[in-house]
């Protein structure tokens, strides 16, 4: 335990403010402050330090080189980066200047860089992941934190490595896959534990957990919404999983399984994910979408926890269960990421995006605990950019600025960290200068290891940037990153059993250990250092929480030990407690030791600082004293000089006069005049130099920057290249479009052929069908004739017998009307059965009806006796019926055949329509083909025009190239001329130098003169005095007196001359420097000449290459021309085939038009048939009206007929509408025929045009072939010429630069020539002056000699006094000159500041001037010594000088003439270049305009095609609608025919009813006297009439016969009882709100309006359903079973479409089942009618549900009288059983309106029987 504890690599915390008071050590040795303190530290904690050094690890840097793109491959063959081995890379400097931003070379042609691992351009994503990222992922699973970030330029492949594509996924998705594949079953699915801040976690409540789940689901929903617009996530994940097979990660998963096997099975992992970006120094969460209201995102804040680790506040963390979810979240974040377009990259990331994965290691027990929190941050940094290359503006520029600043701060931080490891004093690391480095701070301070991925491109254009990136990575690789936190975690947590549950509030150990101490760990950032008071408070709080937590930990340990008694023994408990106590003691001891250490170190540091400060103060004092002393000395010297000058002036006034002194003084005055002339000439030279410098400066300023000019030319060149590439692409596209259109035309022709074949076959079918129709129409006419004949025969028989007339009419109506076969056959069979039964039983025949057959007879025997005489008539009728049935069957077969024929006609019509559509489509296709041909022709024309334009452009460019080559040649000639002139100038200068050597003799005399002027040597005076004594001894005394006064005067004069001489020496030094510079310039000129020769050689090589290329191009052109000819021949063949197809299509069209005319005639015939049918229908209607007039008794029949007439009117209207539509269709058909004729004309015209077009197309094709060949050749020529043009441009720029340099040098040489001329002139003047002075001196000497011999001493004294005065004047002049010199020095300093660039030239001139001055001085001295001898030599020199001047003038004239010529040539070149640029701009504008026109034409074509497609779709829709209308009309016609059939059936039924009623009336009239005699006379009179009347009414209204309650029908020995109707209700589905109610006594019905029932809710419906079931069960069912005959079943089957109103099912109370039927019928209850009506309403539509009660109340009043009468007359029968019935008769009925028919034989279910309620007992 001790070893593990001491080996912790945790940064030493500060223990200054501890809880335990520790005494300060009394004696501390501070001698070795600057010595190595590591020995003392090792004594205190040797193990901790050793392990801390071991835990430090250098930053891992992996390099990945991006492969070349296609554009880069075209530009360069080899890159500037070369891989030596897996860890080293060599960066070679590119030879071209474009790769470097600066023209200066770095000096190293190749630089070597080493990395942790190098990945070449051929490495895949898988290899890179396994080599670089696999180890950090393993460390993450082990519980360690890691940071991975990419670094590099834009467009270097950072985002590709980070994210990848769907085919080759990057680092991030692969890490997610590996994580989840390795964890698999160990995932912690709950969300109750969530990461918080940097290394902490939160325990969530159930509500918070729900919120987390809801937010996660909302995010996933967003992803689904995103995937609706884009590709589905499943496909993305599928691609992800496909690209990541199991085989790829088998090895890695095995490693993880081995690593995970060491852990306990109870440990599980919870994976959380976040994704944010740093954009413009603001942090945004990428999982949060942009708000729709404000279009802004929420900005997040970066903060630090107590440990100093940075985290982002309010960042969204989401738990992830599998890699699919994580990848979907990543895609969502990428969608929200800020990406923009730049010149270098289409999708450049404009922010630093950081995707973090946090893993919580949880011990999954009863109370889950977090053992460890590990983190993996994957940062995709934005690339550094240069605005010169990206050319960003506005917002993009601001983004680049922020990106570059953040990357610069990262570089600063890494550089400081690298330097601080070597230095003793820790430097401040500027982490807080950007958000990125602030976030990385915790990792650099020991949170975890860092891996840096460097992405570079091997392109030579980005050489400087790649060099900077590699340098940065080399620095980063040397940075040592401590991994203290992970090691501390390993020690703190230890095994799983001893791990403590870390939370937000209880995290004391880590807090105390991770507080950073400023003394030992040397904090990296000053901002992170807290104030002392804050430290005190935090540390006190930390210790308090520590004490509390230790107690809590002890309690928790005790509890866990008690729970695990079965597993842990008492001895183990004691050991653990002892260990805890030992650890506590060790902690206390360590705290004390660390406090003492800290105090020592702080005191040592303070002492060092005080010593350093004292030394600094002493050094400053010394420097100040030295400066003061220097200033004082200078001041004293100046004062002394001033005093000397003043004293000398005073002494000169009091001096005596001496003749010898005057002579010396005259000589000295002459010398002074020479110096004054020199100073004047110097001033003039300085003024000229100033003027020349200003002119040169202005000229330099006016010149444009060569870099800008080259950049502009490069841009123009790139633009031209891009435009050429676009034109190439467009030409390729046009070719592809032409091919596509040819293919489309071929397919269309094939379709036309197939359609023509189909049309021919269909025409044949149509002809066959028409023949069949004609045959069938003949048969129909025959049948119609037969029909008319039968009608006439029946009308003749009508007069004979009235009773048989009715039956015959009925049969004729049955024959005329078309009835379905099934129903007729059933009716006939039923009748036969009835007759057979009647014959067997000797009973009268039963009354028959179509819907309800209910013929009730009271007395069978009586009726049988009465009806026997009618048997013979019935047998006749039966025979007729059999005949009629045979005819009907025959008619039915014919009708079916007619229907089939009609269906076939409809199909034929449809086929005709279909063929018409196909015809129109073929016509449209022909139109489109013709349009496409026109478009192709227009495209050909455009292409030819473009070719002509390109030819003209090529010619112009060739002319430009020729001009440029001429310009280059002229420039080279001018350079050679200039070089020759420079050589001539050099030769002249050499000649001048030789002349200088000749004039050395005269220089000796000038040196003698200078020696005389320099007053430092005192021997000169005695020599002159001796010469004078030799002439005259008398003057010696006066000279001696003069000597006494003279030295004082001479000292002051000599001092001033010495100062001037020093200035002259400085000027000489400057001139020597300038001479050196002239030599260097000469060397540069020689280099330039060599370069010019090299360029000439290159030009010759290029010309040879051009000749070769031209030969190759000619060969290629010939081959292309041949290929194009072959293609044209093929196209001609295809066009001929197309034309043949078009001719065939025309033939097919003519055939179709003939078919259409035939169909029109047939349609007209069909229309005539329809009209005949309509006439017949009208005839039948008239017959019906006649019958109604004859039968005035039956009023209701008229009403029904009126309704039928209304229906007929509707049908007539429909027929009219159909006629109108048919007319419209006819008009459309006429229009179509007209269109077809027009199309024929158009086709004829088109054929003529096509014949003309063929010839034109052939010509065009030939021209196209030639032009396309030319275009391709011209394009190739253009590309090559453009390349040559670019090379020539570059050479031109270089040549221009050289010309400029030569011009500068020539101007410099000119200035030098001018200066030399001026100097020569000055020297000549000086020589003339010297010769004059010599003459004057000789004369004065002679005069003095004569005066010495002749004159007296007084004259000499006077001259001496004059000389003294002259000397005083000259001294004043000298002082003035000094002042002027000082002023000139000041002006020169100012000029040096303004004209720094021209100082070297000025210095050269000054040095040359000084040389010439020295020479002049030498000449003067020599002339003084040898005056007589040198006159002749001087004359020779003067002659030579004049010759030289003449030569110089001639050379200047020549030079000026050459310069004028050169300037004129230059101006010509400039004008030519400008003209060429203007022409090029015009061409570019023309090209742009043509391009815009082309785009406009394309857009117009697209619009036209869209319009055509829309029109086609509209036509198709119209045709579909027309077909639908035709189909609907046919359906309506069928419906009308069926309705007519139904109406005929109804008429027949009515006629039958009338006949039956007439028979019954006759029978009743016969039976009346018999019935009156019998009992119950009232009943016998009233009931039959009412029953019969009601029967007739019910038949008329409902189409069904209802029997009276007192009548019984006996069919097949079954007795059925029916109730007598008390109320008649009539309604139609057309008017659901109205209902006609008729009382039994009234003749006319009463209309009742029913409002619409409100919709009920679902609860009410359920309740109502239950009530309805109870009510149904409450209604008593009849025990009688009513037999339903086959006739009834057939009628039900017939009229399922009509809503049948069923009769009421409620029966009356019976006395007994075995009683007589007559008695039972006589005793009925009138109360049952209401119950029956209620039952009827229960089965009625939903409209009556709400108003049933009101209707029953209205009826109850009319029924009371009838009920009472019946009760009086009829005795009440006995009750056999109590029946169940509903007490509430008028309760609302809850039955849906859809149920109209009810099955009468439905049985009640057990469930319903249980629900039934017993009826309440009613009072008697």
UniProtKB/Swiss-Prot annotation:
UniProt-listed InterPro entries = KIF11-like, Kinesin_motor_CS, Kinesin_motor_dom, Kinesin_motor_dom_sf, P-loop_NTPase
**What are its GO cellular component terms?**
centrosome; ciliary basal body; contractile ring; cytoplasm; cytosol; growth cone; intercellular bridge; kinesin complex
Q: Compositional bias (Basic and acidic residues) at which positions?
A: 1247-1264
- Describe the location of the Kinesin motor domain by residue ranges: 58-479
Disulfide-linked positions:
none
Q: Which domain of life is it from?
A: Eukaryota
Q: Read off the Pfam families from this record.
A: Kinesin (PF00225)
Q: Which gene encodes it?
A: KIF20B
Which region ranges are annotated with the description Interaction with PIN1? 1560-1820
Record-linked SMART domains? KISc
Q: Per the record, which residues fall in region Necessary and sufficient for interaction with SHTN1?
A: 1050-1107
This protein's species is Homo sapiens
Q: Name one GO biological process term.
A: microtubule-based movement
Tissues with expression: Brain, ovary, kidney and testis (at protein level). Overexpressed in bladder cancer cells (at protein level). Expressed in testis. Overexpressed in bladder cancer cells.
Q: Where is this region: Disordered?
A: 829-866, 1247-1275, 1760-1781
Using the record's annotations, give every residue carrying the modification Phosphothreonine. 560, 1644
Polar residues composition-biased segments: 1265-1274, 1760-1772
Coiled coil stretches, renumbered: 523-603, 674-793
Q: Where in the cell is it found?
A: Nucleus; Cytoplasm, Cytoskeleton, Microtubule organizing center, Centrosome; Nucleus, Nucleolus; Nucleus, Nucleoplasm
Q: What is the lineage of its organism?
A: Eukaryota, Metazoa, Chordata, Craniata, Vertebrata
Keyword Transport in record: no
Listed name of the protein: Kinesin-like protein KIF20B
Name the keywords, alphabetized. Answer: ATP-binding, Cell cycle, Cell division, Cell projection, Coiled coil, Cytoplasm, Cytoskeleton, Microtubule, Mitosis, Motor protein, Nucleotide-binding, Nucleus, Oncogene, Phosphoprotein
